[in-house]
Design a protein with these regions (language model features):
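Bacterial Sec-dependent N-terminal signal peptides
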Residues: 1-24
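Catalytic cores of secreted/periplasmic lytic hydrolases that degrade extracellular macromolecules
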Residues: 17-60, 65-174
Length: 174
């Protein structure tokens, strides 16, 4: 009986140690992902100045949501962290989403290429002019739910704005 208790205690200690290590590793991976996105963001704005700045936390939160912290197939195989679709016809420039040949997800050469594309999309594409205008007029954003509600053409999930707003909130406390 003593041997069983000792074995059980040892197993519990090992499992707890494994859980802590796994949690620490997960947190480190998340921090590394944020740093990578932030590095691309900073590089973009060192070169590009304009009348609209898309907030870093906005870009990062959408990348986190759309790519599952960079773990999605599209992020890993195509450096697509924002779920950007394409009409490209050359297979080198797209991946098929979920076996549906009609849904093509764009491929990028690097994470930074995708971050640059996303920022330009939001800042300059007429379909997102309400979003760009919001950021032009509101340099200090405290509630992102309003601006996220202007992105209906970007997402299909009706809960998407709330999910991304939740990520933004958690990043502001990170």
């Amino acid at each position: 009986m003593k041997t069983f208790k000792l074995l059980a205690s040892t197993l519990v200690v090992l499992l707890l140690g494994f859980s802590v290590t796994t949690a620490e590793q997960t947190m480190q991976k998340k921090e590394a992902f944020i740093k990578q996105i932030n590095g691309c963001y900073t590089s973009y704005y060192k070169v590009h100045t304009g009348d609209v700045t898309i907030p870093n936390v906005f870009v990062t939160a959408i990348a986190i949501h759309e790519s599952g912290w960079g773990t999605s197939r599209f992020a890993k195989e195509g450096h697509n962290y924002f779920g950007i679709r394409t009409t490209a016809t050359d297979p080198k420039h797209f991946m098929i989403a979920g076996g549906d040949a009609k849904v093509k997800v764009a491929k990028y050469d690097s994470m930074c290429d995708n971050v640059e594309y996303f920022i330009n999309l939001i800042a300059y594409d007429p379909r997102y002019s309400d979003v760009a205008d919001y950021f032009k007029q509101n340099k200090q954003v405290t509630d992102y739910k309003e601006v996220l509600s202007y992105m209906n053409i970007y997402h299909e999930d009706p809960l998407w704005p709330n999910k991304v707003a939740g990520i933004i909130s958690s990043l502001q406390n990170f």
